[in-house]
Amino acid sequence: MKVLCLGGSGGMGRYATRAIADFEELEAITIADLNKDAAEEFAKSFDAKVQGIGLDVTDTKNLAEALKEHDLVLNTTGPFFMFGVPILKAAIENNCHYMDICDDWEPTEEMLKLDSHAKDVGISAIIGLGASPGITNLMGLVAMEELDSVDTVITGWDLSSVNPAEESSQTGTNAAMIHGIQQMTGKVKIFEDGQLSMVQSLKELKINYPGKGIYKANIFGHPEAISFPYHFPKIKNSFNVAHGSKKIDIFIIKIILWLSEKNIISQDKAANIFHWLETQTNRPSFSSKKAGLPAIYGLAHGIKNGSAASVGVTFSANNLEKEVSMGEATGHPLALGLKLFLQGKINKSGVFAPEGGVIDTEDFFKAYAELEGLEEGLDISRSWEI
């Protein structure tokens, strides 16, 4: 099998590339990047089956030619609100299986609409297979499966728990930060009271996590909020939220976003400020955040044995102690998607979010533990056991 890694030498993509480089099933890996020199230089750190090329994903002809020459594409080219939909369309049209780390809700809506097109041509596409979305979706799915019926799904993550990626081929404004500005300004889409609606980003939401108590978090514009009701239309509420280790985290964010919304500073400038702040921040240890919400989690509320119940799913305490970069947290789940595909464990045609029934959660988290050198098993908090 031949795999094309779009953005494969970038801050997220290089971690996925490193993780798949030793997959014996792969005949060839092509690292494609707008920065040709960076792609070629990064490819030199692997064996001969890995090559680097320059590729502008907005050049539709060259993109199509590259896709035709490969069996599957791993897309880490952001921001996805610009590049997600056209690249997925191109992959389907050129008979190339597809996986990405799309973390914007707007293109997620449009990409899910391509499901029938992908089914017609026998293409498997998984969108949002990173940390959040990605790991959070699968944790949320584990939580849902513990209940007899589900009315609310919440996926969440700690703004301060992941270290910024230290390496990247990217120059100029950081794409991840542009994404963050996009999803923290204005309104974002959520699913509430059985329908999709727009709410102000960073709106405060109280989270009741079994065994931990009630904490405040803030609504974030990630795809989980809309992908869960897409795949599970009987649920009533779906939110993605973020929290900080300190109140000052959200306060600083809101000040910078206010400056951007009032056009006092540009979105690029705001993104650069956030990127600088990330590099200056001391990340909290696990012991400093274990009393609050987990660093990453899925939470479901519903009914169990006729009574109201809730289930929270996160990594075990020992596993949460390991510090990871944003690149690792995002790129490694994508690599595992490819691994499961190569093993024949992802074999459905269509366009899916991670929770859409195409990934077995037990298979995924077992592979994740092996890749990261972690203890197997998740920490599952059940309200009826507390």
Where are these predicted regions, by residue range?
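Conserved Rossmann-fold cofactor-binding substructure of NAD(P)-dependent oxidoreductases
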Residues: 56-69, 79
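ADP-ribose/adenylate-binding Rossmann-like module
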Residues: 79, 90-108
